[in-house]
């Protein structure tokens, strides 16, 4: 009784963890027998109390957490803000998805943590609480779904469903939540069935690998160990894991604290000793593990350590391999059952945050960080090395170290409040997460035209397609507008920016705008209008060519151009772009008439022509053939010239064709029908047979002409030709027939006819020899082409009115596009152009102007009597200016800079258009389509544009409309002029050019002195293609600049010929995001593009921005029309797989089967080469490789152990490291024999044990080359020393056949092979104590060797080799002898 009085009475609730700890202490103090007696009493007590309590469970016991309401409300608020950011184009869809998941995941986790304290305070004896937290039934996550919130669910692929279930099962689910819940729960049910079988198979493979590992010796005598220290370079190891790692291990080295030895080598560690190490703060402790054991196919007691069952050193004969395999496999079977209850609820992970401890100012070194975006799209700083951040408050200075690759979310010198998040530690910094690459497709919400605000380049695997890569973060814009496709004729009189009545605008996908019967009169009216009467007709006159008076040294080439190509500069990112001429109609000379699609002008993208470049080309329809054939030049050969300038690239790649310059005035075309068929096609005609027209050649092809059939079989295809013509069998006397392939002019007789008929046309004679003896002649018809006289330039381009000196000449050159005797092949339903007429630009080289080596092309918009016309002007420039292509980014704009302003954007003022703009009216914007047959028009109706203004700080003369002032955002309706603006030019007495400078030459001032007449503009102005506006009002000295929405006053003493350009505030074509404010008190803009800039207001075409980050793939070309639902962008991002054990088990399997998880970095090979070079340089050849191989193996072993442990720990499963180490040791202990050397012992490519390879090398006293290799558990099972064990696992026939051929011997060392053959197993009682004998003497020698301060780099190399030999001879030889003796007996 006296003893009991000293006992301390603890009145405390203990949970499962505390009971575990109590039992382990009891075993340490009292041993197994007494402990089991105590535990029996505890069990009886527990059952008594449980029976007395009799817990009941009712629905009222499920108490919802009170803080849930405002937590969910807060998460919804954050989601709403996120949605707005996405709408404004600040974050893209992937960032939005990520952040949304993290918001809801954090809310759900917080609710789960609140649950336990809530129960403990309000109702500690709540049956739900008692059951789940005692571990009797259910766990925290299941109870959380009952009383917290069900949260985010995974779909069957393990992907997240981003709509969270906010209710819990107690409150009940809404219909949507119920469907999502069933979706996830089904995944749980299916997974359970599949994973159970997977887990069983995993256990079988694991046991297979390690079944032969038995404890067969007390000490293998190794001098190696693995050091464990509580403080690592990167992080602190938690005390719990540190204790778990050390308990039950055996020390590999003596441990000193100061000069005192506290523990000696080969001593096993108990809890007392480990606690003493922690107290004294020992730096590193070297322990023995299965990795360090020197035994080849079993393990020694010291390297294994204590047995987990009874807490003493493991007994000899214990089958530790099978225990290890089952310890790892068994939790897999258990854990699969857990998923059933949680029902596919998503369990992910969020990043850790560093918070400020109190209010203060942040200070850090800005040179060590650089700006970036977080994965949620927030601005942040990324630090590459450890960054010290100092928080200064009034009286304290606190320093925080932020690890590398973390995000700093605050700026330098920023004031932070207490608990504010200042940094985010990246999730993947310390933890091992299985990531997968996922593609996310973003689809267009609306129909419209695609623009982008930065240069993009082609994705490497899609060089010639419409997939582009985004190099830096930028916006993609979809400009609104309905598309309408039609033939060229219907809209040929409408130009860009015209207004027209849209009779029928189909919004359906890719439909063609069709005019109904009722609207025929409307279209008729367009065409029959009298073009001379410009006032009445709503259509401006485009059919005549107007001359232009030139007042400078430029030469003007006169032609109106199609305006739909006005944004070609932005679209074509190739060498040059095309502008087709408008149709040129000459009434008198019908010969000269050319279709307007025929002539194309090729202008380089920088607008600069070199000498002798092709300026324009024309494909004459007379030289066009539908059929295939052969081209012959007749007698005179032509020079082959290749001019790379002749090829125009258009949406794809073209190989440069050879062009043949003509010296002949005629050439011949011999037609033939050619079919190229696949190998497998059935041909229904014979070679050298004669067929009629419309004969069936194959199942679905009929011949177009009749004649002789030739069938040639080539690689993977059959070429079938049909030659039309007459067949003649010549006499021996005919000489001509011997020459095959000649042309015979008209007037000559046929070579073999007895009657001398005259040949009317040219013919082509071809000799055909079906067999050696037999031949005949085929006479084929020939089409003759004469090269016509060159086109008269005067008809194409009117003469210069001022009769100036002509610097620039145009030469007409004809090119034949195919060589002599070359076959021409047409693709189906296309015609072949044989001759191309080109205009070549040339000019005289003056001595004075020797620097004028280039011509520059300009676009000019000139207006006469209310009509605006577009011209190309080609002028000579000095070459040194031409390469300066500078963009003027205004410093003070504060808005989007004018980088992506369209250089060829022009707004055409037309006096004649006075239609009222009703709902069904629209403005045409043409754009280039790949299909040349039809044009697509983009029609902007009034719903696509809105008007901003007037702006208060702008001074203007005439107030346009009082009603506009009251409501700044007005949809444009029923105002006159294009898009509701009255544009009218009066006082245009005579007609003169408006000189403009192209953007490429940077000129600071706009010259206005050429304007002899006063240009008076009422509320409107002229705009050229650069978006510049010239406005001279003599009364006010005001120059309106389009780039600023304000006026610029000229001083009286200012030189009157120049007005200065000012920086831009709003420029044409500029993009705005939503809610940007331009003027100080002006309204907030909607997102869009500035279409019309007026004195006091701006018209904006609505547009939707999409954010694209680097590496995103854009589908489509610049300026292309996209329809609703088209794929716009593909984002590729890394995503952590959810940490459910349903995904966890495959992770373990993935590691054990050594499948690669992450993509390997490209420069890994370079690093390995570098490492090999340096280490061999330091240590010399043999030792360098040895150390390198050893380090590789050790490092990969430790890494594999940590990865597997991490997966199990994340599920709350504790597995001792030594079980995993035994498995990992087996999959890393094989090496692959290389080609060089060792040929007399092992075959190249053979897998042998690492220790065996080392010993063989020492025995042979020669270098042995092998590579360390990681084998998966399946391959390791099929590469053991026992072929019986391998055959009983998989591929029985193959393994046995191979073993028989090689004459393998099975020594029956493992358990499995003995079971198969019905013998006793060499483990437990069947383990023969006399099997291994190690004398005391040898052990002493080893210990003496160890006490010498042995270091690899201090002793002589010879000593080390000697030591190795002696060590192995002493420890191995006797054991080998005894083992062989045992087997013989």
UniProtKB/Swiss-Prot annotation:
Q: List the Pfam families hit by this protein, alphabetically.
A: RNA_pol_Rpb1_4, RNA_pol_Rpb1_5
Question: Where in or outside the cell?
Answer: Plastid, Chloroplast
GO BP of this protein: DNA-templated transcription
Q: Which cofactor does it need?
A: Zn(2+)
**Cellular component aspect of the GO annotation:** chloroplast; DNA-directed RNA polymerase complex; mitochondrion
A GO term, aspect molecular function = DNA-directed RNA polymerase activity
* Keywords noted in UniProt: Chloroplast, DNA-directed RNA polymerase, Metal-binding, Nucleotidyltransferase, Plastid, Transcription, Transferase, Zinc
Under Enzyme Commission nomenclature, its number is 2.7.7.6
SUPFAM superfamilies attached to this UniProt entry: beta and beta-prime subunits of DNA dependent RNA-polymerase
Q: Which domain of life is it from?
A: Eukaryota
* Name of the top EC class for this enzyme: transferase
Q: What is its main location?
A: plastid
Q: Quick one: which residues bind Zn(2+)?
A: 220, 293, 300, 303
Q: Gene3D superfamilies recorded for this chain?
A: 1.10.132.30, 1.10.150.390, 1.10.1790.20, RNA polymerase Rpb1, domain 3
The reaction(s) this protein catalyses: RNA(n) + a ribonucleoside 5'-triphosphate = RNA(n+1) + diphosphate
Question: What does the cofactor section's free text say about binding?
Answer: Binds 1 Zn(2+) ion per subunit.
InterPro entries annotated for this entry?
Answer: DNA-dir_RpoC2_beta_pp (IPR012756), RNA_pol_beta''_euk (IPR050254), RNA_pol_Rpb1_3_sf (IPR042102), RNA_pol_Rpb1_4 (IPR007083), RNA_pol_Rpb1_5 (IPR007081), Rpb1_funnel_sf (IPR038120)
Summary of subunit composition and partner proteins? In plastids the minimal PEP RNA polymerase catalytic core is composed of four subunits: alpha, beta, beta', and beta''. When a (nuclear-encoded) sigma factor is associated with the core the holoenzyme is formed, which can initiate transcription.
Function per UniProt:
DNA-dependent RNA polymerase catalyzes the transcription of DNA into RNA using the four ribonucleoside triphosphates as substrates.
Q: Which family does it belong to?
A: Belongs to the RNA polymerase beta' chain family. RpoC2 subfamily.
Put simply, this protein is called DNA-directed RNA polymerase subunit beta''
Organism name:
Aethionema cordifolium
- Gene behind the chain: rpoC2
